[in-house]
Amino acid sequence: VGVSGTGGGFKRFMAGETDISDASRYIKGKEQQGCAEAGIEYIELPVAYDGLAVVVNKANDFATTMTIAELRAMWAADSASKKWSDIRAGWPDREFKLYAPGQDSGTFDYFTETVNGKSGNCRPDATFSEDDNVLVRGVAGDPDGIAFFGLAYYVENKDQLGVVAIDGGDGP
């Protein structure tokens, strides 16, 4: 038994260190190839799907809804945005703080691909952790914190966090 993010789990699976690998995404082509090269046969068995939540500190009363373009302006690797006011006129002229799952996380892969157009495309100045509880504590303790992680972590901590409605183009 091992604990890691999805990417790390697949690395251990391909190395023969684990027999089962749960994941928050489908196995990637390079991971399929790694299994084939190692002589490992596998099956994908979807058991459940998780939601993804973008969250802010409970005291944040302005970032209640954001567009994909606004998220990209915050999270993309080439983003120069530093303050909430850089994201939307009328928001505070204070620096935001980004918290994100580690780069071995399937949640990280999904978010960066969906929001920023490429898996792994994320600015390096975020605070990264494979432990979502660390991200929860970071945002809960930082009035200008923002993070993304599995919906279950928001539900467990909604007394400390606010969830951001995402407008994908048709309204939140």
Model feature map: region roles:
Residues 1-172:
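Exported/periplasmic ABC-transporter solute-binding proteins
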